[in-house]
UniProtKB/Swiss-Prot annotation:
E.C. no: 2.1.1.186
Gene Ontology BP, a term: rRNA processing
Keyword field: Cytoplasm, Methyltransferase, rRNA processing, S-adenosyl-L-methionine, Transferase
Gene Ontology molecular-function annotations: S-adenosylmethionine-dependent methyltransferase activity
Family: Belongs to the class I-like SAM-binding methyltransferase superfamily. RNA methyltransferase RlmE family. RlmM subfamily.
Gene giving rise to this polypeptide: rlmM
Protein name per its UniProtKB record: Ribosomal RNA large subunit methyltransferase M
InterPro entries cross-referenced by the UniProt entry: RlmM_FDX, RlmM_THUMP-like, RNA_MeTrfase_FtsJ_dom, rRNA_MeTrfase_M, SAM-dependent_MTases_sf
HAMAP family with a match to the protein in the record: 23SrRNA_methyltr_M (MF_01551)
Superkingdom to which the source organism belongs: Bacteria
Record text on subunit structure and interactions: Monomer.
Length: 352
């Protein structure tokens, strides 16, 4: 199992290659990354047979920025038109017993077509794996991840459930709320799922908390905050959705989001303003560094080139700034499924 397969947003294969190559070099695990443009996946081929397993053991998936999902295996294998299950059982003879099964596809138009096949194929495959003793429900065991590039080509991979994506392919199944004024609302909801353990939501996303939404109009992110019954200052020169204003929980301030400062410390600051990432990074530095908020979710809009390098530079500058202030800050940064040419950062100021 010398190959690490990583899913990603189409068009960001280069960022995944740069990110995993940097980590592998730091960990002294030799190998090379390969991908095709807009293929929505990257393979990192290790020189050592156990290289992919060592990478997954040494890295925390949650700390990777651009990969949506990962799995280790020997590479893609071909399947016949018939007797696919028999071929897979033969391939899995050398694998450990697995505790769960996910059938995955790539986030491409071809992948969407393959998903129909996967839905039909999963039930008989699961039954065959259980009967053969290759699958039993136990989250302490590795997860079997089958990534189908077509009905005839599959990557037979493994990953630890607690060190891989929260959802198949890293894609959450979130329902767009009809009352929300824009689809951007799903970005903030996904960020909460990604960065905040579900059992902590009632404490960290509690009613009557104070929140500021910078660049709020028309109110997609504000809707999520109001839905949690927070008191929100919506900062934007543009108009807010009327249903949000009728809630009685929103104070609309028509000022520049980058100039606004709250009169008192707030629990949450969220920001989805289209601006150069360096300027947004400086905004994060001010709000967290000066104690204007306890937690923040902020989107960094990325340039067309050197996107991974730009994100790394901003995160490094933030860490250095907070260290110089003597602050303890928890970081998270991920390109979420609902993100486009951007990444989402979560920061939480901790008490020393």
């Amino acid at each position: 199992m010398n190959t690490l397969l990583m899913h990603c947003r189409p068009g960001f294969e280069g960022e995944v290659c740069a990110e995993i190559a940097e980590h592998a070099a730091t960990l002294e695990i030799p190998g090379y990354a390969r991908s095709k443009p807009a293929s929505a996946h990257v393979e990192f081929v290790c020189q050592d047979v156990d290289g992919a397993e060592r990478l997954m053991r040494r890295l925390r998936f949650a700390e990777l920025i651009f990969p949506r999902q990962w799995a280790r295996g020997p590479g893609f294998i071909e399947l016949p038109e018939s007797q696919r299950i028999e071929v897979l059982l033969e391939e899995l003879a050398s694998y450990p017993v697995c505790g769960s099964l996910w059938l995955e596809v790539l986030d491409t138009n071809a992948g969407k077509e393959v998903s129909t096949f996967c839905r039909k194929f999963e039930k008989p495959l699961r039954a065959a794996l259980v009967k053969a003793g290759r699958l039993q429900e136990d989250l302490a065991l590795p997860r079997l991840l089958l990534t189908f590039r077509s009905g005839r080509e599959v990557f037979v991979g493994l990953a630890e459930p607690r060190n891989s994506a929260l959802w198949p392919m890293g894609i959450p199944r979130l329902k767009f709320p009809r009352e929300a004024p824009s689809r951007s609302t799903l970005k903030l909801e996904e960020a909460w799922h990604q960065f905040i353990p579900r059992q902590e939501w009632d404490k960290r996303l509690a009613p009557d908390m104070l929140a500021v939404d910078l660049g709020a109009a028309p109110g997609g992110w504000t809707w999520q905050l109001v839905n949690r019954e927070m008191r929100v200052t919506a900062v934007d020169n543009g108009p807010m959705a009327e249903n949000l204003m009728y809630s009685g929980l929103v104070d609309h301030q028509k000022v520049d989001g980058y100039q606004y400062r709250p009169r008192q410390r707030v629990d949450w600051m969220v920001c989805d303003i289209v601006e150069k990432p360096a300027r947004t990074g400086a905004l994060i530095e001010t709000w967290i560094g000066e104690g204007l908020c306890r937690e923040a979710v902020v989107n960094l809009k990325l340039p067309m080139k050197q996107r991974y390098a730009e994100v790394r530079k901003i995160l490094q500058r933030l860490r250095e700034s907070f260290d110089a202030r003597g602050l303890k800050v928890a970081f998270g940064c991920k390109q979420l499924y609902h993100d486009r040419e951007e990444v989402t950062c979560h920061l939480r100021r901790l008490e020393r």
